[in-house]
From Swiss-Prot:
Species of the source: Acinetobacter baylyi (strain ATCC 33305 / BD413 / ADP1)
Gene Ontology biological process terms, A to Z: urea catabolic process
Gene: ureA
SUPFAM superfamilies given in the database record: Urease, gamma-subunit
Protein name stated in the entry: Urease subunit gamma
Pathway the protein contributes to: Nitrogen metabolism; urea degradation; CO(2) and NH(3) from urea (urease route): step 1/1
Catalytic activity annotation: urea + 2 H2O + H(+) = hydrogencarbonate + 2 NH4(+)
Protein localization: Cytoplasm
Length: 100
């Protein structure tokens, strides 16, 4: 399988997001990289499902709460940015204060 660098990045985000999703499902609190991966993967999947940038910006704030992450992690993540592919091209999706 031949993947370009962008496709490799998306594959890495998806894999890390899947690990984070499984850990969250087991009741574990997510650390910083897991929380960012969880949100990023969900945003990429949302774009694939046809959500708009505005919808994704709101959706990103609903995925995790402070009770889902280790102490201090919510304060460490001021924003999450991911370049998602939409029918009309790639766009940068930014979610400010994703963990409330």
């Amino acid at each position: 399988m031949e993947l370009n660098p962008t496709e490799k990045d998306k594959m890495l985000i998806f894999t890390a997001g899947l690990v984070a999703e499984r850990r969250k499902a087991r009741g574990l609190k997510l650390n910083y990289p897991e929380a960012v991966a969880f949100i990023s993967a969900a945003l990429l999947e949302g774009a694939r499902d046809g959500m708009s940038v505005a919808e994704l910006m709101h959706y990103g704030t609903t995925l995790l709460s402070k009770s889902d992450v280790m102490d201090g992690v919510a304060e460490m993540i001021a924003e999450v940015q991911v370049e998602a592919t939409f029918p009309d091209g790639s766009k940068l999706v930014t979610v400010h204060q994703p963990i409330v």
